[in-house]
Regions:
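Positively charged, small/polar-rich N-terminal and surface patches that mediate targeting and assembly
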Residues: 1-114
Length: 114
């Protein structure tokens, strides 16, 4: 099994979730986060009437799903179709091995099933 984590702009989350569902990924977790990548950070004000300054972080979201090894290429292709824009700061996708899963309802551990 593999953990696929797509770090995308907040406006892309629904598209990524729809793409995952369309290819048969059975679930996903969405996490809001801040980070410093190569993308330009927005100009913001700390409060009304204060001068503009560059934000320290960009706001992004991680869409995380666990899939069988055989689905990884399909999932990556589906994400790329809806997210790849050619512009800096669009995000990244990481793939990690998942050695074991523990179901917290039953306490059952498994190396090959969700």
């Amino acid at each position: 099994m593999k953990k696929v984590e797509a770090i995308v702009k907040p406006g892309m989350v629904r598209d990524v979730l729809s793409a995952l569902k369309a290819v048969g990924a059975s679930g996903a977790t969405v996490v809001s986060e801040r980070g410093q990548g190569r993308g330009a950070r927005p100009l913001i004000r700390d409060s009304k009437g204060t001068p503009l300054h560059t934000a320290e972080y960009n706001t992004m979201n991680s869409v995380i799903t666990i899939v069988n090894d055989s689905m990884v290429d399909t999932v990556l292709t589906a994400i790329a179709k809806v997210v790849v824009s050619g512009s800096k700061g669009s995000g990244k996708v990481f793939v990690f091995p998942v050695d074991e899963v523990m179901d917290l309802e039953t306490g059952r551990r498994s190396s090959n099933s969700m």
